Amino acid sequence: MYNKRKASYEMGRENFMSSQQLVNLRIDFAFKQLFGTSGNEDILIAFLNAMLQDSLESPIVSLQFADPHLHREHEEDKLSILDISATLDTGTKVNVEIQLNNNHDMIKCSLYYWGRLYTAQLQKGMPYSSLHKTITINLLNFVMFPEYEAFHTTGVLWNRQQHKILSSDIEVHIVEISKLMQQWRNEQVNPWEDLFVRWLLLLPANEDEQLTQTLEDIAMNQDPILQKAMNKWERM
């Protein structure tokens, strides 16, 4: 069935925009415009629900975009601007970063962003129990872990002795988009059935017309939020 669906792109549609004209969503300004602007909350919710289904106790119902600036407490502090910062209906904080090139310090950078978002929640007089889970998501356009095939890596605070999570408040996700693209070309993943794969494949779809048309088939047949995202993407 998947091969038949995948082959359906050959039929085409006269009005379909060529992938050559589509903006690269792995460029931060385009990514933020689609996933991080007011009015597109439902698009980010769909993406996060697909990605974090094993991390959250229940699906995200609503979220609010937060100020992406990590404000300096002291003049000498580093000024940082996040790609996307949001607060979920449960209070969980989420940061999503898109990275085109390997700067060789992604883990430390992600932990720094996590720490700033986590500590910023606590104001004077507030108990530590008021701190909410904080998740950082790094979408990488390069291979970071060549030693294994999996394109999605999740880091947590781990109790080595008891072999269980020490705290669920910290969670760092690494997604290697180039690995996923190779798996799609090898027909190892199925965007018709896997929501997470579907949304991730949207990011590099500008360079592959077959993939773009496959995603549009899926959007038109079974995913109205993806269809909204693709319509907005085509108008960029």
Task: Describe the residue ranges of each PLM region.
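Elongated, amphipathic alpha-helical interaction scaffolds
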Residues: 1-236
